[in-house]
Amino acid sequence: MLAMNQSLNELKDQVLKCTNCSLAYTRRQVIFGEGNPRASIMVVGEAPGYDEDIQGRPFVGKSGQLLDKILAACGFSRTEHLYISNIVKCHPPENRVPTLNEAEICMPYLLKQIEIIDPKILILLGASSLKYMAGNTYRITRDRGKWIPVNGRLAMPVFHPAALLRNPALKRPTWDDYKEVVRKYRELLMSIISRITYSN
C-alpha cells in the first residue's frame, strides 16, 4: 500500500508541474484525481469544469453531485470503492471540449494512474472519455451499457452526468448501465472470495 501511494504521489508531483500544453497557462490548478488508490473501479471523465478548477477536486459541480447520487445508489463511495480522474487534468477555458492535442498530451498521465491503481472495471463517462480510451470506432449512443475491452480491462461506457442534466430521459437507461456495473463488481468480488476460500 505504501509503495502504491508513493508511486501515485510521485506521479501527482509530476502532473502538478506539467506545462506541456496551453491549458497550463489558463488553469487555476491541476485536478489530478481522488479516491481509493486500491479501488476496483475507476471512473474516467472528460476534463475538469469551472467548479473543479476552483475547488481542486474532480466532479464537484452539478454533474458531480448527480454522479455522487448515482454512485451512492449503487452502494459505492469515492473514498472506499472508486478512484475518479479525467482524460485531461486541467480546466479547458469556457468549459469547452479538450482538443485532440490536449488529450494526447495528457493521456500518458491517466494511463499511468490506471497502471498504478490497477482497477478491474473502468466507467467511461461520455463520448470524449469513450473515444480517447477505446478509439474512434465507438459511439456513446450505440455502445453505452456494453462491456468493451480497454487495455486488458473491462470498461463500461455510460452517458456523462451533464447529458442526464440536459436530457432527463437518459436517466433510466443510464441507471440500467450502472446496475450492470454493480452486477459485474459483485461477480468479480465473489470470484476473489472463492479463490481465497479454496486456497485455504
Give the ranges of each region predicted by the language model.
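A polyanion-binding, active-site-adjacent surface
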Residues: 1-200
